Amino acid sequence: MRQTLCDGYLVIFALAQAVILLMLTPLFTGISRQIRARMHSRRGPGIWQDYRDIHKLFKRQEVAPTSSGLMFRLMPWVLISSMLVLAMALPLFITVSPFAGGGDLITLIYLLALFRFFFALSGLDTGSPFAGVGASRELTLGILVEPMLILSLLVLALIAGSTHIEMISNTLAMGWNSPLTTVLALLACGFACFIEMGKIPFDVAEAEQELQEGPLTEYSGAGLALAKWGLGLKQVVMASLFVALFLPFGRAQELSLACLLTSLVVTLLKVLLIFVLASIAENTLARGRFLLIHHVTWLGFSLAALAWVFWLTGL
C-alpha cells in the first residue's frame, strides 16, 4: 500500500489517526471508570464525565509552586506530544505506518522513556515530598517494566527480520511461523502494556486512590487537564500498540471510503475490547505493595526471556 500513497496522504493519515485517538481518549477512560464503578456495585460517573472534567479544568486557574521550574511547566506538553508521535506511527487503521520515522522499535522505547522521564522529573521539580515519592516510584517501575517490553519486542523483531512496527505487524498478519515463541512474546508484551497503562496493582506512581496523587499533586488548571489527558492517551496508545502487533486483522487494504470506515470501526472495537479486558483485570486485583512489585514483574520478564530462548531453538 505504501507505493500507492504519496507523502501528503501519509501525513493526513498520521494526523487523522493521532487526532482520533486523542479525542476518543476521555471516552475510553470514562468507560473504564464506569466498569470499575459497576464492579464495585456503584452507579459511578457517566462515560462522558472525563470530557466534562477536562473542559472544567481548562477553565480553572493554573497555580504552580514557587520552587517549580521549566520541567514542571513542560511536562504536560511532553506527555501529550510524545504519545501523539507514537499514535501517528502505529499501523492501526491501514497496513502501513503513516509516520514511518516514528515506527521503529528504538524510537518507540525512547518515546516511552521520555514520557516517564519528564513525568518523574516534574514531580522532583516541585519540591513536594509526595510528588518526589511518586517520581521515584515511577522511575523504579520503569526499570522493572522496560526490559520486559524491550525483550518481547526484540523477539518479534527477530521473527519479522525488522525492527519497524509496520514490518512486524504485517509479518504476524500473514501467519505465525513460530507459534510458541509468538505466544510467549504476546503474553510478555501484553503484561508490559498492562503495566504501562498504569492499571492496578501497577498504579504505584499516580496512586489515584490515595490522598496525594504522586507527581500530579501540585498541578492544577490546564496543566492538570493536559497531564491527565496525556496519561489517558498513553493507555489508549499502549492498547493500540498491542492491537497493531497481535490483532492486525480488519485494517484497510485499499483506499476506498468503505474500507477505511470499516477499518476505523473494527480497530476501535478492538482497542475498546483491550480496554474492557484491562479494566476487568484491574478491578479483580488488589493494590499491591510497592516493595513487592518486582516479584510480579519478574514473571513477565521470564516469559520474554523464554520467548527469546524458544526463538533461538527454532520453536
From Swiss-Prot:
One of its GO terms (cellular component) is formate dehydrogenase complex. GO terms for biological process: anaerobic electron transport chain; anaerobic respiration; DNA damage response; formate oxidation; glucose catabolic process. Residues 32-73, 120-140, 203-228, 278-289 are cytoplasmic. Its main location: membrane. The chain crosses the membrane at residues 11-31, 74-94, 99-119, 141-161, 182-202, 229-249, 257-277, 290-310. Its EC number is 1.-.-.-. Residues 1-10, 95-98, 162-181, 250-256, 311-315 are periplasmic. PROSITE patterns: COMPLEX1_ND1_2 (PS00668). It is found in: Cell inner membrane. GO terms for molecular function: oxidoreductase activity. Signal peptide: none annotated. Pfam families: NADHdh. Keywords: Cell inner membrane, Cell membrane, Membrane, NAD, Oxidoreductase, Transmembrane, Transmembrane helix. InterPro entries: ComplexI_Subunit1, NADH_UbQ_OxRdtase_su1/FPO, NADH_UbQ_OxRdtase_su1_CS. Possible component of hydrogenase 4. This is Hydrogenase-4 component C.
